[in-house]
Amino acid sequence: MTDVVLTHMHMDHVGGLLVEGVKERLRPDLRIHVAAAEIKFWESPDFSRTSMPTGFPDAIRSTAKRFREEYQSQLRLFDDEQQVAPGVVVRRTGGHTPGHSVVRVASGGDRLTFAGDAVFA
């Protein structure tokens, strides 16, 4: 595996990368693609308009900080759109989170769009 695309940074999407021992099993040159807006949001998220259980916002911030610290050198941030590989493009759409992205895959005449958790926007 050479690339990972994160549609957003909720724990159910980044958590597997934070499991003890996982990073050591990944390629040192692994590229992790994520929208710059997503990183910016999780550095200082505004949860003032949401109702979350006590302590949950702090847990989210802590996870995002740990992810950024552990994978900083492997992050490939993009503003609007980035080609990950031939036929694979990631595009920031916002919605579910400020930097939520979709992945478009094209092969021959076939097309696929993976929308992450956009249904929960």
Listing of model-derived features with the role each one plays in the protein:
Residues L26-R92:
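Metallo-beta-lactamase
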Residues P98-A121:
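Cap/insert and terminal regions of metallo-dependent hydrolase folds
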